[in-house]
Amino acid sequence: MVDVEELMSKIKSGVWSTQDAFDCIKDLEQEYLQSSKTKEWREDYSLAAYFTSYGIFACSYRECVFPMIELCQKLLEDCPNSADQALYYLALMRLYFVTGFQPKIVEYGLKYVETGYADRMNLKSTYNSIVVAFTENDLFEEALYYLEKMIDVTRNDPAAEGVDFWNGDTINEIVYLDSLV
C-alpha cells in the first residue's frame, strides 16, 4: 500500500526514483483490483494515485507515464466521487504533459477545471499547462484567453498579495501572444 506522507516526502527530498514510481504503480494497481471488487476505497487512495503521477511528472519519468495513464483511466471508470475524479483528471493532464501530447493536456485540464473541485494553485498550474499546449500548436488566441484566466485566478488569490502583474515576464508573454492573434 502506498503511504501518501512517505511518497510526498520522497518527492520533495529528491530521493524519488524510477523504481519508486514503478513500485507505487504496482501497489496502486493491486489495491485497485481489490477495491474495484469490493467497491470500498481507502480514504487517501486518490491522493496516493495523484502524488504518484505528480512524482512521475516532476521528475519526467517517461517510462512510467503510460502504465500510470492506464491506471488513472481505469480509476475514472470506477471513480467513487467527484473530488477523486478531479485528482485523476489533474494527474492525467500532468502525465500527458510529460509526453507532450497537447490535445490530451487541454482535454484533461479543462475536465479538471469543470469538476468544481479545482484549488487555486492547481488551477493556475492547469491554466499554465493549457497555455503551453495552445502556444506549442500556434493557437495564440486560445493561449491568450487561458493566460488571462490564469492571471485572474492569481489576481483574486488572497495569498498572492504583492504579486506584480506588470513585471517584465507577464507583460512580455501577454504582448507576445497578443501580437500573434
Question: Whereabouts are the PLM-identified features?
Answer:
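Small side chains
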Residues: 21, 48-49, 55, 72, ...
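Acidic, Ser/Thr-rich low-complexity linear motifs
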Residues: 121, 157-170
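Alpha-helical junction/boundary sensor with strong preference for TPR arrays
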Residues: 31-36, 72, 76-79, 109, ...
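Helix-turn-helix repeat elements of alpha-solenoid scaffolds
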Residues: 14-30, 58-71, 97-110, 145-148
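Inter-repeat boundary and helix-capping residues of tandem alpha-helical solenoids
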Residues: 21, 37-45, 65, 82, ...
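Alpha-helical adaptor scaffolds
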Residues: 52-61, 80-103, 107-118
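TPR/TPR-like (Sel1-like) alpha-helical repeat modules
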Residues: 141-158
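Amphipathic alpha-helical repeat scaffolds of TPR domains
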Residues: 1-13, 37-58, 82-94, 124-132, ...
